[in-house]
Amino acid sequence: MSDFDLIVIGAGPAGMSATATAAHGGLNVLLLDEQPRPGGQIYRNVGENRSSRGWLGKDYAAGARFVDTLTHPRVTTQCGATVWRLDSGPRVVWSRDGVSHISTAKHVLLAGGAQERPVPFPGWTLPGVMTAGAAQILMKS
């Protein structure tokens, strides 16, 4: 069991910003996200795609500074983590690589991010047809 001042669930722009702000304010923060790297959908793989930043735009490149803030000594980042229970206390139960963990904190912040909601149209399930979000993931992978 580990204790933190704040547990942030979600490592997209909002989660990373909240984590950095809290850490710079003196709080010990645990940042959890299910993806293999922080960044959310908009900054997916920004730390890995340094050569692609130019053609993905300056806003995408700016996301690297968010990822860089996660190296603060008061921040513990766990990517590839699945949160499967949140109890009073608050107590967060999560797993990573098949190992379960229990972390407690004074506060929990949920930064679940955005989710694309596609609108079905004739032919939308045909091979090669994809949503804007799927195309964005493909470009950044």
Specify the residue positions occupied by each region the protein language model found:
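FAD-binding core/adjacent interface of flavoenzyme oxidoreductases
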Residues: M1-F4, I9, A62-S141
